Amino acid sequence: MAAAAPPAGPGLYSDIGKKARDLLYRDYHTDQKFTLTTYAANGAAITVAGTKKNESIFSEIQSQVKNNNVSVDVKATSDSKLITTFTVHDLGTPGLKGILSIPFPYQKSAKAEVQYLHPHAGLNAIVGLNANPLVSFSGVFGTGAFAVGTDVAFDTATGDFTKYNAGLSHTTPDLTAALLLNNKGDSLAASYYHKVSKTSAVGAELAHSFSSNENTLTFGTQHALDELTTVKARFNNFGMASALIQHEFRPKSLVTISTEVDTKAIDKSSKVGLSLVLKP
């Protein structure tokens, strides 16, 4: 089978290094998670989710209604928060998306967001809807093969930049490499993702902190045992080893079992996580 072509555009800033991050960190859990999604007669999606971590339990219920290019999400959480999000796709022009998020009872945390995807650019702007808002902007320029971008946030209340990051990436049909400068220039991370075959991929990330002069090196791999079952493993230079197996026992319904072991303290009990996602 021929390899798929790289994406037509550079995507958003959050897409830089995403393939390596997903391979190394996505779906690894050390807690218990349960998610159930059903659909009402009017097409509304209703999702109930619960997470148990240590002795604490967190739950939420979310409803999503779509009508043409407009969607409305309402989410209620067990800590008495209600968040309503309005999303409009292709807002006046293809590739332009508008998002309005209104939390309750913390209305001062409301924010408006605009995203624009172009074959040679990906832009994202967020502004808080209060008297002294936090303003965020990220931009990526280039193509699906090579992209460079920046991500900044400015607090109008203090007049300070709370975030300024930069990144670049190179993508081919089978390989993605990225370099990110994060934490106001304090940390530098290089990542690599390689699809070595139709069923297997490997990835690595090297992160350096300038303030602590500490390096973190993480290796990972994933392999599809068959069309429904995937296994993953990772290891870092601090001796932390993790593995998971994920099985799609029915369309869109997944069970994931993961474990984490400190190989430098093997006498300590390992951590085990379980995730169950049910969709009709």
Curated annotation (Swiss-Prot):
Keyword Cell membrane applies: no
- Pfam families, A to Z: Porin_3 (PF01459)
Its tissue distribution reads: Expressed in roots, stems, leaves, palea, lemma and pollen.
Tagged with keyword Hydrolase? no
Q: What is its main location?
A: mitochondrion
InterPro entries the record matches: Porin_dom_sf, Porin_Euk, Porin_Euk/Tom40
Q: What induces or represses this gene?
A: Not induced by osmotic stress.
For this chain, one GO molecular function annotation is: porin activity
Q: Name one GO cellular component term.
A: pore complex
Keywords linked to the UniProt accession: Ion transport, Membrane, Mitochondrion, Mitochondrion outer membrane, Porin, Transmembrane, Transmembrane beta strand, Transport
Q: Where in the cell is it found?
A: Mitochondrion outer membrane
Q: Which family does it belong to?
A: Belongs to the eukaryotic mitochondrial porin (TC 1.B.8.1) family.
Concerning PANTHER family, the annotation shows:
MITOCHONDRIAL OUTER MEMBRANE PROTEIN PORIN 2, VOLTAGE-DEPENDENT ANION-SELECTIVE CHANNEL
Q: What does this protein do?
A: Forms a channel through the mitochondrial outer membrane that allows diffusion of small hydrophilic molecules. The channel adopts an open conformation at low or zero membrane potential and a closed conformation at potentials above 30-40 mV. The open state has a weak anion selectivity whereas the closed state is cation-selective.
Fill in the domain comment: Consists mainly of membrane-spanning sided beta-sheets.
Q: What is this protein called?
A: Mitochondrial outer membrane protein porin 2
Species the sequence originates in: Oryza sativa subsp. japonica
List the gene name.
VDAC2
